[in-house]
Amino acid sequence: MKKIITTLLLAITTFCLPDLSAQKTTVMVPINVSESSIHWLGKKITGQHEGNINLLSGTLIMENGLLTGGDFVVDMNSIASTDLKGESAKKLEGSLKSEEWFDAENHPQAKLVFTSVVSQDGGLYNVTGDFTIKGKTNPTNFELQLNYLEATAKVIIDLLFIFITS
């Protein structure tokens, strides 16, 4: 898996939000990290790997019941494989945490900060944000579906930006 992965898929689900429809002012809504999950998918020429990674913290900013901002902090030391078991999983996880990939020892957190949020129909939002991983920040766009007690997003990150200057 030498610098072949070109995308990282983060499916952020189940935020367990309070009833936001009744909000009439700006409210910072903390994400319930124990009820949230991030699923990653890394693709390479010869296949793919997938797993989970823990959310350390997160906040959604709501204004008059609409999403206007937010941020998430991810624990890079928690990256785990779900498609491999035993020694194979440990080897992949060790590689991903190493300096060669995410350098979790020196960069233990990744962060996504919303820079623009555009409301669509039916609780759908087009979000633009800055994603910082391994000390490098690049823009990303994604759709976020926000319902009564759940928010779901699929974020695709091209990891080439991490390795261009590495």
Ranges and model annotations:
Residues 1-4:
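Positively charged n-region of N-terminal signal peptides that target proteins for export
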Residues 7-16:
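Bacterial N-terminal signal peptides
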Residues 20-166:
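Low-complexity, acidic/polar, glycine-enriched regions of mature
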